[in-house]
Amino acid sequence: MTLVSGKPLSRYPWLVRLMLWKQRRSYGRVLDPSLLWGRSPRVFAGLALLYGALDRRSSPIPPSLRSLVTVRVSQLNHCAFCIDVNSATLARRGVPMEKIAQLSEWRTSPLFDADERLALEYAEAITRNGVDDELRARVKSRWSDDEIIEITGLIAFQNLSSKFNATLDVPAQGFCRIPDGTARDISTPRQ
């Protein structure tokens, strides 16, 4: 059961309606979380600006790596909406569906390279229980300070977003289907 619902579009301030219109043009529909965030227009605007800054074209983190991290954090936080929309973005960024379907098994899958493994390990540590000194040293030896800030900010943002959506029980909106075409939850390994 959803804890909070959106309200009729006419009841949102003009700035929120403009943001929702832009989403409809980009995604073909309004994203359900935006109807919730839109209840607090200033927070919604700040959130949108932060996401835009973190997922910009000029980011020092490659687009596919950014998307891998956002999907994995979404899986860890059991956010159906985030897994759905971020997996669709990951596929649009050229990552094969087979790899997306194996994301929860990244440690043993041969489909992930060293950079991806480090980013996913870092994302899991931040999301689950914190980063130890050994992992900090590996991150520091691989990425520049600016890259560390960018990827850490993205992971923190995705934790905020996915925990918000999971807590409010925001459902998937059907953006991404896994290879076999079923609705299997890609957050857990195959049995």
Task: Indicate where each model-derived feature is located.
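Hydrophobic alpha-helical segments
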Residues: M1-Q191
